[in-house]
Amino acid sequence: IDTLGLDLIIGPLLTKNFNFLSSQSAFIDIPKVAPLSSNPVKMRKGVFQSISPKNFLRKEMLSHLKNIIDDEDNVIIVADSTNLYIEKELNELFPKSVNIRPEFGDFLLPDLIDSLIVDSMPNKIILETEKFSLISSASSQIRSQLSDEKKISLYTTYHGTAYDNKNLSNTLFSDLGFTYLSDSYPKSIIDTDFSIQFINRFGLPPNKIAIRAYDLIIDLLLRISTQNSLNSSILIGETEYFNNKFNYVPFNDESFINEGYYLLRHKLYDIIEINK
């Protein structure tokens, strides 16, 4: 491959294949963009991780929770067995917090939920799981406690793909003011030229991955055309397109990660962006 004429390389899509390419000396001086996978890639020279890393999003959400939760709140943490380290970190951040562990079958004991959610102070519940079954059962049980006397808000420090399952009720999440960080904002683009052309060609509206790919390519093209190189384009700062933000910052060994994100909340059957 003649690498002299390459401004950048996008992909491969699979993490294993991307790591192999980034390890090759022939490509060491060429920017290499990891496009779609949320799995961490090897951060070698010239690597751009375009998906905001999970640990970064979690750190930012912890900072947000610290700003909005105080001693007047009743903090309850619901964490499964794979997220006990986050439970511990939350306990250290909120010393008065109470932990609830799901039972076998991913449900919460109704009597325990009823006794821990109070009407004397706001209830701030933090759900730490990436399992659809627990998200569904826990959010439903928590919603059943909501009343004029009991004020409940729901949060998570990491909004994984399980939360996007179409079988989950947006109405339920709206009732709980479910708040989280995300590397994308699922607002409608149905009337845009891109969406119309996509439907005309493929017969269906673009999904999350198609929109992500479009936003990423447009961003990379604009960065190179205006700044001559991807490395120098980090001086631009944050950019935003249909559903995605890009804010590349140095990581290590001349690599870069995207620290663009949205702080989102379910409200009135919709998802809105709130101030960070």
Give names to the regions the model predicted:
Residues 43-48, 110-114, 161-174:
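Glycine-rich, charge-decorated loop segments at or immediately adjacent to ligand/cofactor-binding or catalytic sites
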Residues 2-3, 23-27, 66-70, 95, ...:
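Sec-exported extracytoplasmic/periplasmic mature domains
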Residues 1, 96-119:
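A short, well-structured beta->alpha microelement
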Residues 2-14, 33-35, 74-80, 120-138, ...:
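Periplasmic-binding protein-like
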Residues 203-213, 221-275:
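Segments of small-molecule ligand-sensing domains
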Residues 6, 18-22, 58-62, 87, ...:
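Extracytoplasmic/secreted envelope proteins and their assembly/folding machinery
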Residues 10-90, 164:
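Extracytoplasmic ligand/sensor domains, especially the bilobed periplasmic-binding protein
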Residues 139-212:
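Extracellular/periplasmic periplasmic-binding protein-like sensory domains
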